[in-house]
A protein has these predicted regions:
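Short secondary-structure boundary segments
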Residues: 45-47, 129, 193-194, 267-268
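Alpha/beta enzyme core
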Residues: 104-241, 247-262
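N-terminal capping/small domains of soluble enzymes
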Residues: 1-97, 102-104
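A short, charged, Gly/Pro-tolerant segment at domain boundaries
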Residues: 296-305
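C-terminal helical cap(s) of enzyme catalytic domains, especially alpha/beta-barrels
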Residues: 55-64, 200-214, 256, 268-293
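Short acidic/polar active-site loop segments enriched in Thr and Asp
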Residues: 39-40, 45, 95, 122-125, ...
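Surface-exposed amphipathic alpha-helices with a cationic face
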Residues: 6-7, 11, 82-93, 117, ...
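Short glycine-centered, acidic/aromatic-flanked micro-motifs in structured strand/loop junctions
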Residues: 21, 101, 129, 167, ...
């Protein structure tokens, strides 16, 4: 009998399948389709201090092998998430959940994380450092090791629960960013976030997205995710959550061999709302097909092959 359980920052997961933030909402809508308790956990939609209405339309564009999005962190704000979204989730999900946090200043990250840290349902805080730093010329925190470390250090000092830093792939060396976050106290890292891209409407002769650029997700970016998980695994000793183009159980196994402790789908949930349930269902057979008895034994296994 195969063993699919893994441990993430001291919390045991039944399996390593973790739907990525942004495409799984706050979970309860998917619970109308299937029992979401089958998942290892999931990361809910990015939360900011204030309500955000998001970017102008159109926000979504098709792309070869995936899609572009520029939703713009639309969410009701942290107080509404705690008062309205988490109680609804508690009725249908009976495991610790990952709270994804976005901010435009270190102070905002700290305030939002501190509030979510006090919520019983929240098991981990996932800090999305792909946001622009309004006090740093607008560059994303995640593009500079010092800025990434500053956010990580400030959040760690303010909370008790494990801090996972979500890394941007739009950098010269993701390993350097990961190492800076680890040195600043991060308990884990998650990667990759979407890859910056653009599509242009040939008839209108202007960008398809109102925001001009957007984040590319879907199967086309999966090899990038594998490469970056590999590089980060060689740079740090903290756990890695792998994501980016995951659509099937074999993809999760591949990310784990590259160094991830867990992995999950993002855009796949928009194509097939049952995608992550199907990955959980198919995982034991995929393990048998590749002679894998215990998932904990294969983490980073390709580095020793």
């Amino acid at each position: 009998m195969v063993r699919a359980a893994v441990s993430l920052c001291g919390i045991e997961l039944d399996n390593p399948v973790i739907p990525a933030s942004g495409t799984f909402g706050h979970g309860y809508t998917f619970a109308e389709l299937y029992d979401i308790d089958c998942l290892g956990t999931f990361s809910f939609k990015g939360t900011t201090r204030e309500q955000r209405l998001g970017n102008a339309q159109p926000r979504i564009a098709e792309a070869p092998g995936g899609m572009l999005n520029a939703v713009g962190l639309q969410n009701p704000g942290v107080d509404a998430v705690i008062a309205e979204e988490l109680p609804r989730l508690k009725q249908v999900f009976h495991k610790p959940v990952m709270a994804n946090v976005s901010g435009f200043s270190i102070e905002e990250y700290v305030e939002v994380c501190r509030k979510l840290d006090a919520c019983e349902q929240v098991g981990w805080l996932e800090v999305n450092i792909s946001c622009p730093n309004v006090h740093g010329g607008g560059l994303a925190f995640g593009t500079d090791p010092k800025a990434a470390a500053s956010v990580t250090r400030a959040v760690k000092a303010a909370v008790k629960k494990p801090v996972i830093v979500k890394l941007s792939p739009n950098v010269t060396s993701i390993a350097d960013i990961a190492r800076a976050c680890e040195d600043a106290g991060a308990d884990a890292v998650s990667l990759i976030n979407t890859v910056l891209g653009m599509r242009i409407d040939l008839r209108a002769k202007r960008p398809l997205l109102a925001n001009k650029t957007g984040g590319m997700s879907g199967p086309a970016i999966f090899p990038l995710a594998v490469r970056m998980v590999w590089q980060v695994y060689e740079a740090v000793r903290i756990p890695i959550i792998g994501m980016g183009g995951v659509t099937r159980a074999e993809d999760v196994l591949e990310l784990m061999l590259a160094g991830a402790t867990a992995g999950g789908g993002g855009a796949a949930n928009l194509v097939n709302p049952y995608a992550c349930r199907d990955i959980v269902r198919d995982l034991p057979q995929a393990m048998q097909n590749y002679n894998i008895q215990n998932l904990k034994d294969i983490i980073g296994g390709a580095h020793h092959g």
